Each structure stands twice: as C-alpha cells, then as structure tokens.
Amino acid sequence: MALWGGRFTQAADQRFKQFNDSLRFDYRLAEQDIVGSVAWSKALVTVGVLTADEQRQLEEALNVLLEEVRANPQQILQSDAEDIHSWVEGKLIDKVGQLGKKLHTGRSRNDQVATDLKLWCKETVRELLTANRQLQSALVETAQANQDAVMPGYTHLQRAQPVTFAHWCLAYVEMLARDESRLQDTLKRLDVSPLGCGALAGTAYEIDREQLAGWLGFTSATRNSLDSVSDRDHVLELLSDAAIGMVHLSRFAEDLIFFNSGEAGFVELSDRVTSGSSLMPQKKNPDALELIRGKCGRVQGALTGMMMTLKGLPLAYNKDMQEDKEGLFDALDTWLDCLHMAALVLDGIQVKRPRCQDAAQQGYANATELADYLVAKGVPFREAHHIVGEAVVEAIRQGKPLEALPLADLQKFSRVIGDDVYPILSLQSCLDKRAAKGGVSPLQVAQAINDAKARLAL
C-alpha cells in the first residue's frame, strides 16, 4: 500500500519502485514503528482526533501486530509495500478497517522514521554497551590469571621493554572503557524525540510533544522541527563510535595474531576459534582474529559513506537520507559480532609463559634500566643513553645479553658501573621499578585489576 498517489496520473515504473523501496532493510524498524504508532494514537486522543475507544482499538490491533512481528519478522519481506511505515499502516487497516486510516493524522514519515531510527539506535547502544563490558570483563579475568606472565613490550614491532600479559590485557580494557564512555555520551544526545515535528514545519495539532516523548521513553522532545527531521548526527556519531571501537578491536586482533604466530609463540588460540587448511594439514589459522581485523574496513567505509551522503544536503528531508540505514545497521551489527567474538577468543587462550619470558630476556629490553642506573650514579641521561648504546653494540658483538657482559667490559664504557648493576638488569627489577601509576610493576598491575573489577562490578 502506497501512502501517496492522488497527485499522480501514472503508476510508478516497476524499476523505479524497486529502486525507491526500502522495506528490504527498514523492516528492521518494525517494532519501533509500531511502538511509535501506539504513542501517536494516544497523542491524537488528547487533541480530539481519536476517541478513547478508537485509540483502544488501534492500540490493541498494534499490539497484536507487534507480537506477530516478533514471532516472524521475515513475514514483512513477503510484502511489496514501499517501506515499513506503509507495511504497518496496511496491516493495521487490515485489522481495524477505516479506523486505521486515521492514525497518520498530523504525522509525516519524516518525523516517523527519525523517531523509529532513534528508538532502534537507543536499543542497539544498550546491546553494544553490554557486549563491551563483557569483553572488558573477559580481559580483566585474563589479566588476573596472567599477572606473572612476563613478555616483551614492543615499539616499532621491535622488543622495547619487558611488560606482562596482564598489562597488555589492561591496555585494551582502557580502550574499551573509552568506547563505553563514547557510547554513553551518544546515548544522552540520542535521547530526544523528533515525533510531532511533521514533515519539517511541525504538526498543526496542539500535541504535548514532551508528554509524547515521555511515552516513548525519551527524556525530552527536540526543539526545532526543521532540524529534527534533517538530523542524522546520531547516525554519524554511532558510526564514529563504531569506527573507533573497531580500530581498537583490529589492533587487539593484530597483536594476538602476532603473539600466536610461530615466530612469537606467546599464546595458543583455542581450536574453537581457529580453522585449518584444505591443503596443509598442519595449519591452525587465527581466522576469528583475522576476520575481526578485516571487518574493521567495512565499518570505516560506512562512516565515510554517510558523511559524504549528508555533506551537501539542504534542509530539510531529502530522499538521500534513506541511505542512512543500511550502512548503520551493517556497521553496528559488525561491531557487536566482533565484540562477542573477541570475548570468545579470550575464552580458552593459553599463554606460553616460558616462551614469553625467554623473549623478554632477549632484544636488550633492559637497556633502559642500565641508563637509569647510570643516571642514579650522577651521569646525565643523554650521556648515559649514549654509553648504553655503545654497550649494546658490544653485547651484540659478543652475542650476549647485557647482564652477561663481564664487569670489566661494562666498565670500558663507564667507570661508575659496579657489581651492583647486575640485580638492576634482571627482568623482575625492570618490572618492579615501573611503580608509578599506570606502570607495569606487579603492585600497579594488581591495583589496576582491582580498580577495573570494581568499576565492572566483578
């Protein structure tokens, strides 16, 4: 059923209809459209368009339709309706006859779809927040189990300083906490209702839009009708949240892909999140992580695409804005799937402590400790930095770690070096000295775990 037609003397070309129709993707807004219609029917009673009995009939029919949709949402796709609004109205008329034609009084699809999409976004943000916190919890639990797993930390993908696997996990907890904060902020700005703004200039009926907003679970109504039907900031903001969140998950995936590689060998992934090769029997591929990394690009693309769609649009509504949904749905579905998959990857991961420790003892990751030792002996840091660089060259020449160089060799570079240097160069000393807030010392890591557990109510 089309919601327009009196102005036209020819039927739409079937090719145009297929090009124009949006039901194939906006069917996902069915529940929100029905809920919004129930609230609108109540508002129409307050301005005398509907009687209380008429509203009751409409609400009962809409609630029946809501249950039918929840039981079988795919039924919607069997229709040739233009969009979800047409489908809902058509089904309502089937149930209550001519009365159903009164529901759209004072309402436009412009404010209707803006409301539907905001309601959907609010629900989806809550799902994302739950999944985000579940992944944070999984990381904290993994950190707690691996506080003593010493491994190399990297800069430029070269061994830099020793850290722990727990400290690595907690780095991603921080990223996810920022993602959580962004979603919470987005939810605040989402929480205003555009319903009652009409096509662009507002409704001609004296509806209490604040009351209407409250019925729909919004904290308030929007302030400007022209902006309300044109606004897709919440789409851009959610896509931005998703883009940043997926960058974090992609980096998480890349780290673990490397840690899982034969070259690093720091972790082994569970069979449940890996796959094999059709040719090479020995292969155990980190497909879950590679897909997380790969899916990051499609989310970035959705954000860029939506920005380009909106950048040249005049006020108010334009059909271009129909393009707001497919990219958003796909991006948020993808982000949600990847959050769940990342948590699954951590469930069953094995950290190979001996291999991690061996790697941490290689690559001269304790060079900074030697520089700090020299500073404590009164050597200016820049000079100490140069001295240690020369000592590393000598250690490489001898094929030894720094702590294995004889004292006489170390003293060639600085006479202030004494026997007390060797305890300083141990891995444990390297960790213990990083005791400022946020550092890798065991005490700081334990504190960070406790803080995260308290925040997440674990």
Swiss-Prot record:
Q: Where in the cell is it found?
A: Cytoplasm
Q: Name one GO molecular function term.
A: argininosuccinate lyase activity
Q: Where are the transmembrane segments?
A: none
Which EC numbers does the record give? 4.3.2.1
Write out the entry's keywords from A to Z: Amino-acid biosynthesis, Arginine biosynthesis, Cytoplasm, Lyase
Q: Which GO cellular component terms, listed alphabetically, does the Swiss-Prot or TrEMBL entry include?
A: cytosol
- Domain of life of the native organism: Bacteria
Q: What class of enzyme is it?
A: lyase
- Biological process per Gene Ontology, one example term: L-arginine biosynthetic process
Q: Which reaction does it catalyse?
A: 2-(N(omega)-L-arginino)succinate = fumarate + L-arginine
Q: Which pathway features in its UniProt record?
A: Amino-acid biosynthesis; L-arginine biosynthesis; L-arginine from L-ornithine and carbamoyl phosphate: step 3/3
Its family remark reads:
Belongs to the lyase 1 family. Argininosuccinate lyase subfamily.
PANTHER family under this entry?
ARGININOSUCCINATE LYASE
Name this protein carries in UniProt = Argininosuccinate lyase
